[in-house]
């Protein structure tokens, strides 16, 4: 069986995001996140990730940047007690894939860095007990 070239290329573009499967049982206590990365050397070679870090990350509520010299870019998911739940490597992801992952995880994206966060999203991405991805 063969696939048409456009479909095959489309599937290949989805590969990085499909390589990380969200385990909702493990991440049910997610409350916030941070992106850890070096400030220059790694990011300058990763244009998509650098675009996300410099332009998109400031728009997300409960998501912060932490510069660590020499560190590969990772999304670190954290509980309300600052316990680490998961580390997701970002180096192989495209900017839109990182944004989609954050959306899937329930992070709220503001229209501008200074925009207010609606009351219902103040605790995002935290979910009430029993909420599922479909409830987001």
UniProtKB/Swiss-Prot annotation:
Q: Where is this motif: Prevents secretion from ER?
A: 133-136
Entry's Gene Ontology cellular component terms: endoplasmic reticulum lumen
List the signal peptide residues: 1-19
Which Pfam families does the record associate with it?
A: Sep15_SelM (PF08806)
Under the heading InterPro entries, the entry gives: Sep15/SelM_sf, Sep15_SelM, Sep15_SelM_dom, Thioredoxin-like_sf
Looking at the record, which segments are called Disordered? 111-136
Q: Which UniProt keywords apply?
A: Endoplasmic reticulum, Selenocysteine, Signal
Please indicate which superkingdom the organism of origin belongs to: Eukaryota
This molecule's function is given as: May function as a thiol-disulfide oxidoreductase that participates in disulfide bond formation.
For this chain, the family text in UniProt reads:
Belongs to the selenoprotein M/F family.
Q: What is this protein called?
A: Selenoprotein M
Q: What is the lineage of its organism?
A: Eukaryota, Metazoa, Chordata, Craniata, Vertebrata
